[in-house]
Every structure is written in structure tokens, then in C-alpha cells.
A protein has these predicted regions:
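Active-site neighborhood of HAD-like aspartate-dependent phosphohydrolases
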Residues: 1-45, 74-75
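Asp-based, Mg2+/Mn2+-dependent phosphohydrolase catalytic module
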Residues: 1-5, 17-18, 80, 104, ...
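An amphipathic alpha-helix signature
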Residues: 21-25, 62, 66-70, 124
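A general structural signal for well-ordered alpha-helical segments in protein cores
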Residues: 40-43, 66, 159
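A metal-dependent, Asp-based hydrolase signature
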Residues: 49-88
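Short, acidic loop-to-helix structural element flanking the phosphoryl-transfer center
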Residues: 62-66, 83-117, 156
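Conserved phosphate-coupling serine/threonine residues in phosphotransfer and NTP-handling enzymes
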Residues: 120
Length: 206
């Protein structure tokens, strides 16, 4: 019986887009560039592309977080300290947590059926900070963050680490997440079934 649920965080149960949008607006205001707050979708596109590159092992996390703002500012034709602005954005993000609609009920339903482990490629400070802001860190039987493991989804080594340290037998696990490229592809590579759970709608290619 598959009753060990390996549950993704961002855009599966956590409303990352809301947290990110608010943090971006505050960072732009802090930098004296309030007019750019309305260009969040442009920043998001750059950020998403870099995270995909991270999943493929093409960039490091430390370079990604600064490069996203450097590219955004370059596209907007403005000069700014990308590292400083990222620091402001990230600091706000770490304390700004929201659940997606229905996430609390979904989490309770999973917990009633078995054990729930959070698996995420996010940064520890951002993930733990938002979970603590919501008061739900203790609702999980284990939390696995890529930066603490040394490998990121969809790398099979990420999942092997989870199986070994949960502890959870592979044959008892199922992955639930919103990303085809990290959650679903990672589950396939690790030899476990998966459920595409996308509250905002089924992504292209599903």
C-alpha cells in the first residue's frame, strides 16, 4: 500500500507566486524603483527559466538568485545592485507564507491516510521560514530540501536520499507535485508512481 506521500511545496501547497509577487514589490520599493513593481511577470519569466536551468544542473543556486535580478534589470535598462535587491527580496520572501486554496484540507486528508514528507528544491531559509510563518512545519513527518541534501529534483540521488532517511520504502511511496520537469520526471527516474497535482491548472505537456 502506497501510504508514504512525497509532497512538493511551492505551487502544490504553498502559494509561492503570491509570496514572490509581494516580496518583489517590496524589493522594488526599497530600491526606489516602485514603477518596476508592475513588471513582476517579466521577472517571473526570468526566474522560472533560471530555475529550470538549475534543475538541469546548468547553474548554481548562488548564481541563480543574483542573476535573475541582473537579467531583469538589464532588460529594463536600469542599473541596480542585483545582489542587494535580491537580499531584500529574499528576506521578505522568507517571512511571507501563504497556502493555496484547499491546501490545508488536502494536507489533512493525506495525513489521515499515512505519512507525509515534504520534498522541495527551495532554499532552506525560504522554505522553513514560510512553513514557520504558517505554523505547519510540524505537520510533516519529514522535510527534505535540495540545498541540505546536495542534489535537486529530478536527480535520482535526491529521491534515493529521501528513501534512505525518511525512512520510507520505495514501494510504499508516491510523489505528488505540480512540476512535470522536477516532480513527475524525478519520480519516474526513481521508479515510483506520481500524481500531477496542479491547483492552478494542468501545465503544458501534461
Amino acid at each position: 500500500m502506497r501510504n508514504n506521500y512525497l509532497l512538493d511545496a511551492d505551487e502544490t501547497i504553498l502559494d509561492f507566486l503570491r509570496s514572490s509577487r509581494e516580496s518583489f514589490a517590496q524589493a522594488m520599493a526599497w530600491a526606489g524603483m516602485e514603477r518596476l513593481a508592475s513588471d513582476y511577470e517579466k521577472f517571473r519569466a526570468v526566474n522560472d527559466a533560471l530555475w529550470k536551468a538549475y534543475e538541469r544542473g546548468e547553474v548554481t543556486k548562488s548564481s541563480l538568485v543574483v542573476e535573475r535580478f541582473a537579467r531583469f534589470f538589464a532588460a529594463e535598462g536600469v542599473e541596480a545592485d542585483a545582489a542587494a535587491v535580491n537580499g531584500r527580496y529574499f528576506g521578505t520572501l522568507c517571512a511571507t507564507g501563504y497556502l493555496l486554496p484547499g491546501a490545508a484540507e488536502f494536507l489533512r486528508a493525506l495525513r489521515a491516510r499515512g505519512k507525509v514528507y515534504l520534498i522541495t528544491n527551495g532554499t532552506p531559509a525560504a522554505q522553513y521560514g514560510r512553513l514557520d510563518a504558517l505554523g505547519i512545519r510540524g505537520d510533516f513527518d519529514g522535510i527534505f530540501v535540495s540545498d541540505e541534501i546536495g542534489f535537486a529534483k529530478p536527480d535520482v540521488r535526491f529521491f534515493e536520499y529521501v528513501f534512505a532517511h525518511a525512512p520510507a520504502r520505495r514501494e510504499d511511496c508516491i510523489v505528488i507535485g505540480d512540476s512535470l520537469s522536477s516532480d513527475i520526471a524525478g519520480a519516474r527516474g526513481a521508479g515510483v508512481p506520481s500524481i500531477l497535482y496542479a491547483p492552478r491548472g494542468v501545465p503544458d505537456g501534461a
